[in-house]
Amino acid sequence: MNTLLVTGTSTDVGKTVVTAALTALARAEALPVAVCKPAQTGVAPGEPGDLAEVRRLAGPVPTLELARYPEPLAPDTAARRCGAPLLTLDETATAVRGLDAELTVVEGAGGLLVRIGEFTLLDLARELDAPVLVVAAAGLGTLNHTELTIRALDAAGVRCAGVVIGAWPAEPDLASVCNREDLPRLTGVPIVGAVPAGVGAWDHDRFTAAVPGWFAPGWSPRLPFNSDSPPSTWGFDTSQSGT
């Protein structure tokens, strides 16, 4: 079993839509895939959460949510406020390993060092010896946030599977266009995908048909980028639109 963890440079950068896109891409390659969201926050019991959105966009796949907290806060804060037990690293890693799939995609909460329980996504990546895909914003601030995230991965000895722009605008401003060129140069990690802004509102058929065009040719979630390899420049189509 291969595991790929998905983190963001911050909250609301498009992790769930990127997770759905990765899942759809794996399904298009006939790769058995499962998705885990260790902790869901800001959603009441019985309401659809991020995993429901992944299934809606990517299609029926096995999913696993280990904990849910009603307040939209960092998972450990939300757990403490409602008196729920904190997730542990051991139980989470065991649950991920127990999923019956050739590829398991694990979506974190917020950024790399947000506490999911008694641990962070970085801790989980080290425990699973799994690479991490970084979802970044397109505009101002992303150079600093992305480089900080990748430096934290490097310092911990965790492989980076690449950077994906989580919401590429239909009409990118100058900062976004410059960031597209500067991110690989500054981080040493290639941009392996760019998901158009707004595609999370699409239906399943439209979403899955478009997914292959959002990732670099030849890149696959089953073959994550090795950070020891030289970065490449992918000239993704900046005219893509999620409208």
Curated annotation (Swiss-Prot):
List of residues binding Mg(2+): T16, D50, E107
Location in the cell: Cytoplasm
Enzyme class name: ligase
Catalytic activity: (7R,8S)-7,8-diammoniononanoate + CO2 + ATP = (4R,5S)-dethiobiotin + ADP + phosphate + 3 H(+)
One of the record's GO cellular component terms: cytosol
EC number: 6.3.3.3
Subunit structure: Homodimer.
Name assigned to this protein: ATP-dependent dethiobiotin synthetase BioD
Biological classification of the source: Bacteria, Bacillati, Actinomycetota, Actinomycetes, Mycobacteriales
